[in-house]
Amino acid sequence: MRSNKINNVDLFTSAANDNFNKHIKTQSKQALEIINKKINWTKLLKPIEEIITKTKQNNSPAGRRTFDLLVIVKCFILQSIYDLSDPRLEEEIADRRSFQIFLGLNSSDSIPDETTICRYRELFASLELDKELFYEFNKQLTELNFIVGKGTIVDATIKQAQAKPSSNRDKDADFTKKRGKTYYGYKGHIAIDSETEVIKKVEFSSAKIHDSNMFNSLIDETEQVVLADKGYANQQRKRNLRSKGIFCGILDKGYRNRELSRKQKKKNRLLSSVRNAVERPFSFMKQVLNYSRCSYYDIRRNRFEFIMCAFVYNIRRLITLTT
């Protein structure tokens, strides 16, 4: 018989895979209660509210039916955890008291409809408020010493586009090749803290952008160690890191006429055992959040989706590290 007590390491697995059955609903309720307690919402949202207030845009929700920004951001979190479309989220908020409690709504309060959720997503994507949200939360993690900054591990993942290449519906997606296979879509780039596995930085691009092009924007150049796979191998890059006193843990790359030495292979194996930690956020996004491909047809909204998944992953790390 399964216990109702949540194993915090698997908290999001329990919540995201709840299938809306009665037993797991109890775990989901507990999961949402823990999230509510762990985050300083006022501090998180203040800079975002200031940006929205200062920005005068034709597509702003102002003047239409509006909701507290806290409710909207929590709606985005629910969508990421439970893999819900806008219409399905509206239905579940109306049906599930645990969702209403998480959002701070009474049973008599109006709930955000699918149009409202969509409008706010457009606002966040157009103003890059998803990035602001992510980095404001990371400030809280830094204050808690969960972003240590001694070591950084960099990697990227390919996300298949929602549109087919032949449809020409997605103007931002593009092609790339990996291990001889062609992909059409985007890339999500991350840098994690090597000690806590918290995602420190995020970038999002079309798939044609080489992983290494995002390298400089993902590192701080104040860390002691940087690790990355051989796709980032570049002699000038290695020299730059070493000149700053940073240990270069970029895996060596072999070439057709210059294979790796035994020493280099051994070094790669040792570095890989540490570097592999960067695969865990991507695995979490795919296996737990069911984020296996893009949902939208442009880079702004697909970036928003990726960064929200990274944000939820960091919430999960906060809970795991503080329990």
Language-model segments: residues:
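Basic, short loop/linker segments at the boundary and entry of helix-turn-helix/winged-helix-like folds
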Residues: 32-77, 81
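Structural motif
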Residues: 61-70, 180, 297-304
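Short, basic interhelical loop/turn and adjoining N-cap
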Residues: 97-107
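Helix-centered, glycine/charged polyanion-binding patches within enzymatic domains
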Residues: 224-225, 230-300
